[in-house]
């Protein structure tokens, strides 16, 4: 009825677009970056060659994002929360954390990420409501402000302190926090468990907070990415004349000749 055509993208394309959306948050001296995109049903981890991203420039990034490795984990704030919804949140959090920890450990690429983080050659970019809310809590904002959150840095110590606060205040306390509110309060702990597990896997990693990601990557790709050639329309010379046109031309020729 609307005339709109929808396209379902795969996990790899989602990882690519999230990387494009966050490209200008890559630190100039970084050798590589882990983009952590936490969604409702999955979490995409993209290990990006930061040097290649700088050398190739924005256009090169659009044509081919220099992703060294990536994975789509069956972990999301909704699915993880639902899996342990039968438990009190105090009981549920350690179990959610353990489940997230085990799932991340199954990705073979995590070892290379951990080594690079330990050598201080890499950092993380976190793009999700969970990460932006954690930043808002850490910054003690009286309301959510994108200009303060987007691009700010979270150390592991600061991030875990914010997670502890959210666990300690409980559901009602989270609902009263101005940067979380009613809508996100129920899903914050499952998202925190995922972030917590990522930091456990990469303990030396700093995380840059991104209030941007997949949507912005999609828009940038549509606006500036390689354009698909449009199908050529046949000109008038290429058209086969209709019977009506032929008859009219024959009649005109007879009149001109008589």
PLM feature segments, named:
Residues 36-38:
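Catalytic cores of RNA-modifying enzymes
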Residues 1-32, 47, 55-57, 64-244, ...:
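Helical "lid/coupling" subdomains associated with nucleotide-phosphate turnover
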Residues 40-47:
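Acidic, divalent-metal-coordinating active-site segment for phosphoryl/phosphodiester hydrolysis
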């Amino acid at each position: 009825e609307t005339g709109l055509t929808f396209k379902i993208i795969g996990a790899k394309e989602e990882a690519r677009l999230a990387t494009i959306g966050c490209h200008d948050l890559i630190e100039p001296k970084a050798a590589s970056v882990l983009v952590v995109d936490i969604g409702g049903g999955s979490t995409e981890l993209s290990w990006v060659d930061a040097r290649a991203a700088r050398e190739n420039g924005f256009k090169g990034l659009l044509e081919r994002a220099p992703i060294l490795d990536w994975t789509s984990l069956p972990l999301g704030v909704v699915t993880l929360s639902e899996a342990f919804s039968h438990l009190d949140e105090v009981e549920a959090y350690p179990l959610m954390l353990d489940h997230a920890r085990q799932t991340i450990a199954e990705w073979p690429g995590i070892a290379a990420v951990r080594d690079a983080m330990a050598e201080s050659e890499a950092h993380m970019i976190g793009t999700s409501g969970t990460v932006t809310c954690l930043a808002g809590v850490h910054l003690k904002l009286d309301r959510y402000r994108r200009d303060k959150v987007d691009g700010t840095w979270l150390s592991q110590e600061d991030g875990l302190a914010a997670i502890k606060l959210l666990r300690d205040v409980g559901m009602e306390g989270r609902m009263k926090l101005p940067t979380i509110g009613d809508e996100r309060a129920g899903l914050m702990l499952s998202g925190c468990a995922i972030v917590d597990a990522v930091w456990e896997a990469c303990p030396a990693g700093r995380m840059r907070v991104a209030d941007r990601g997949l949507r912005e990557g999609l828009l940038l790709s549509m606006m500036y990415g390689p354009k698909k050639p449009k199908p050529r329309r046949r000109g008038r010379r290429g058209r086969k004349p209709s019977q009506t046109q032929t008859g009219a031309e024959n009649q005109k020729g007879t009149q001109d000749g008589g």
